[in-house]
Amino acid sequence: MTTETRDIVVVGGGTAGCFAAATAAQEGLDVALLERKSEDEGGHIACGDAIKGKSTFPDVIDRDYLREEAFTNENIQRALFLNPKGEDIDIPFGDASGAVVDRKRYGEVLLEEADRVGADVHYDTVVQDVTQNGQVTGVTATREGDRVEYDADVVVDAAGSLSLLQDKTDFEGTTFDTNVDYSQFCSAYREVIEVPEPVDYDDAIVFKPTAELGYLWYFPRSDRIINAGLGFQMNKPSFPLVDVLKDDLETRDEFEGATVKDKLGAALPTRRPYDSAVAPGYMAVGDAAGHVNPTTGGGIPGAAKAGHWAATVAGEAIADGDVGEDNLWEYNERVQRDFGKRFAAMDLFNIYGGAHSVDEMTDIVTALPGQMLIDLMGKKGSASLSLAGKLKTGVVTAVKTRGHWGTLYEAYQVNKLATRLKDVYDEYPTSPSGFEDWKADRDEIMDDVYAVTGADPKY
């Protein structure tokens, strides 16, 4: 077995891993990025491909190059909800336009950029274990058939959902969140499909409800290349994703005579971000730390930020000669006070939805005003359910939701709890010493959520 010694070892060459490696390299650290796939397959990851735009990315790579190479459709102006029970719902984005990318090329560019700025990218490297001695000290892996031990001051876990590294690491006595279960994840499958004629929704991301609180999507990379996929919550009975997608595509005229160019599946978190994603010598980022919007599955912007912040904080800790939890804690604080609080708030609506049937949720979504849906699914993480707003649209909404008033009132209560929850996340502790008290405050709100919705505890 050969041994390599680095400042930082990043495991996983997705969005979070590449931004962590690029950031570390830009700061002059000796960093190795371990990617299990071959160089040809690097960047080939199951994804819906929709993002908000290149401005969401930290400026540690050539963002213009990324845009030119991978952003195939920058004209996403609306979300279209295909309603099986009535009129489709068209929600404009206004100034917040989005984009759809070629995910394979996007991933290739990130790996290229990490290499260009100084990270050593090791392809065909499969990590099998974590080394520890009172703290995480590195990983062992097989690289192109040879055993390699990577020693590092900090290991950045960017290995994705249900990370193997977390199974191998002893977190006893640390703050690292181990309250993780498969039921907090979603199973997803997507195909990239070329259609014979241009579609009329190349300016939209299209959603459609499926069984078990999942959704089916059509995201246009162009007017003739569509990313079509679906997912379901793992805490619900499973259903055959491939067959369900196939059956749906067969009902849509635009897919007649279409060609499947690629297909891939994956698990992704549909839970709040990990309460703490650090342990001595160890940091988790991206899907490996639950950095995904639990209602939409969107995770690219959060992963990019998390990778960047983790490497920045790790570099400072290494310079101090102390990579304990106290010195890595600022990373937790940055995540939780930024997108973490919004994702945690959105998770309440996931819990609420899971306590009701898909049909009931569809009826309610159909009846709600469009702006309310924008607020719920957008940046705010809560809806504008003010008294004035309710009075303004109350008559129409009340008539449309007849028979579901109790469930709609639950949504109103959950929305208020989501606002309270974000306030708690704004007070995320500045050091591990306040962590237990903070969790107690947060868990009081979660108890209220379970009482209001009747849902089984998720955590």
Language model feature labels by segment:
Residues 92-112, 233-241:
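Short beta-strand to alpha-helix junction loop
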Residues 27-29, 37-85:
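N-terminal FAD cofactor-binding segment of flavoenzymes
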Residues 3-6, 144-154, 278-281:
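Core beta-strand elements of the Rossmann-like FAD/NAD(P) dinucleotide-binding domain
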Residues 315-459:
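C-terminal helical "tail/cap" subdomain of flavin- and related membrane-associated enzymes
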